[in-house]
């Protein structure tokens, strides 16, 4: 078995979601149910993410993800990273940066990354 299923206690932990579409929204909703503190970085954002941020549920950064965001001043170091951009190149950058920082990363719908 090459891949190992993993459960994380994310209550009160910081999670970075990269991507702002419908898939990212579903991940954010699930992470919030788990008690995670969620930061989203995306060039464009689903309106439901904006609404959630307006209620103080998540932190949003409307811009392109850069690998330095993982250790950026002003952003909490995440316990987990979710790459859900729909852009394989951006997801690959996120996966490599997470690996270099020793942070688990889930790239949505791409086991190879």
Please give the residue ranges for each predicted region.
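Hydrophobic, well-ordered beta-alpha structural blocks that scaffold small-molecule cofactor pockets
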Residues: 1-53
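A short, aliphatic-rich alpha-helical micro-motif
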Residues: 10, 72-76
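Hydrophobic beta-strand scaffold residues
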Residues: 38, 60, 104-105
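Short, ordered loop/turn segments at secondary-structure junctions
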Residues: 43-45, 65, 109-113
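Structural recognition of alpha->loop->beta junctions
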Residues: 53-59
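Short acidic/histidine-rich motifs immediately flanking catalytic phosphotransfer sites
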Residues: 56, 75-80
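Conserved SAM/SAH-binding loop
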Residues: 63-70
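ADP-ribose/adenylate-binding Rossmann-like module
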Residues: 80-113
């Amino acid at each position: 078995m090459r891949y190992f299923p993993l459960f994380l206690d994310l209550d009160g932990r910081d999670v970075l979601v990269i991507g702002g579409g419908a898939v990212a929204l579903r991940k954010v909703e699930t992470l919030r149910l788990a008690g995670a503190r969620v930061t989203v970085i995306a060039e464009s954002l689903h309106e439901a993410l904006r609404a959630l941020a307006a209620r103080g549920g998540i932190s949003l950064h409307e811009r392109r993800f850069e690998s330095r965001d993982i250790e950026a001043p002003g952003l909490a170091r995440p316990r987990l990273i979710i790459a859900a951009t729909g852009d394989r190149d951006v997801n690959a950058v996120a996966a490599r940066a997470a690996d270099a920082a020793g942070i688990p990363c889930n790239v949505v719908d791409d086991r190879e990354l």
